Amino acid sequence: MFDQLDIVEERYEQLNEMLSDPEIVNDSDKLRKYSKEQADLQKTVDVYRDYKSKKEEIAEIDEMLNETEDKEEIEMLKEESASLKSAIPELEEQLKFLLIPKDPNDEKDVIVEIRAAAGGDEAAIFAGDLLRMYSKYAESQNFKTEIVEAAESDHGGYKEISFSVSGSGAYSKLKFENGAHRVQRVPETESGGRIHTSTATVAVLPEVEDVEIEIRNEDLKIDTYRSSGAGGQHVNTTDSAVRITHLPTGVIATSSEKSQIQNREKALKVLKARLYDMKLQEEQQKYAAQRKSAVGTGDRSERVRTYNYPQSRVTDHRIGLTLQKLDQIMEGKLDEIIDALTLSEQTEKLKELNNGEL
């Protein structure tokens, strides 16, 4: 572990020198790239230097203890040494987790897609509830949300809806929402008071830079059409909605706001995210075939969470976490669940680094 930490510290110092080089300072792309790399290493280096400093102080105190016979000084030095030594295990634990390879997509903005699945109108209403939950959570994290495309249901909620979430670390926070979400409750339209089970699927797609995925113009078919709302009524009076089809894969993205130019930009952004996601899914399936992770495979059909309204209970099936806080969670208070899933993923990665042992 310490060999790796020495390499990290050496790279950090190298980046310090590079960032004072006029050639790099005047190149915005390089400056952004190396500044981000340095920022990513900052915490690891800070903790490692704190660790080394405390170890050096302990060694110095040991030397002083060997040289003095003064009882008061010995007592004082022993107390100081004990205090320093008590901090070492926690710092070592921090360093283990800081060395875990980061997901390269963690800092990216995302496109979230929610689709009503089994359960008819109730599933569509639940999709709307999930949209509200994620919007509230995004607001609490100072993330910006924007609707990209929505197909409303006649009885409330959405057949499907996609929206962007922008902010540092958006993907790292929302990536665990991938999968099938199940709700158990009595629908408002149910006169007999029977509990119904409905599901909605959630897909979280990291947004991509042009350099990460190449799309040729000749591979795109772009159509404009008149947008329709719930029940088929026309929302716009002009053909401003845009549908883009990627011909080699058949992947389609649409956007139906008022501006055709904005719709084209939004649809293209979603298309890129979906194509990149296809690539990620292929890689994850290969990985999952070798080893299923503690937080699930990321498969969109995998049941990840159940929201039980009669018992005010939310259960995340991947880590066996149950919370009696349904009202709070539906108001966007997802931190406890997301933190637990993040810790589970980190622990699993740490086990892999240590050949199955913690």
UniProtKB/Swiss-Prot annotation:
<feature type="modified residue" description="N5-methylglutamine">
    <location>
        <position position="233"/>
    </location>
</feature>
<dbReference type="InterPro" id="IPR050057">
    <property type="entry name" value="Prokaryotic/Mito_RF"/>
</dbReference>
<dbReference type="InterPro" id="IPR000352">
    <property type="entry name" value="Pep_chain_release_fac_I"/>
</dbReference>
<keyword id="KW-0648">Protein biosynthesis</keyword>
<dbReference type="Pfam" id="PF03462">
    <property type="entry name" value="PCRF"/>
</dbReference>
<dbReference type="InterPro" id="IPR045853">
    <property type="entry name" value="Pep_chain_release_fac_I_sf"/>
</dbReference>
<comment type="function">
    <text>Peptide chain release factor 1 directs the termination of translation in response to the peptide chain termination codons UAG and UAA.</text>
</comment>
<dbReference type="Pfam" id="PF00472">
    <property type="entry name" value="RF-1"/>
</dbReference>
<comment type="similarity">
    <text>Belongs to the prokaryotic/mitochondrial release factor family.</text>
</comment>
<dbReference type="GO" id="GO:0005737">
    <property type="term" value="C:cytoplasm"/>
</dbReference>
<dbReference type="InterPro" id="IPR005139">
    <property type="entry name" value="PCRF"/>
</dbReference>
<dbReference type="GO" id="GO:0016149">
    <property type="term" value="F:translation release factor activity, codon specific"/>
</dbReference>
<keyword id="KW-0488">Methylation</keyword>
<dbReference type="InterPro" id="IPR004373">
    <property type="entry name" value="RF-1"/>
</dbReference>
<protein>
    <recommendedName>
        <fullName>Peptide chain release factor 1</fullName>
    </recommendedName>
</protein>
<keyword id="KW-0963">Cytoplasm</keyword>
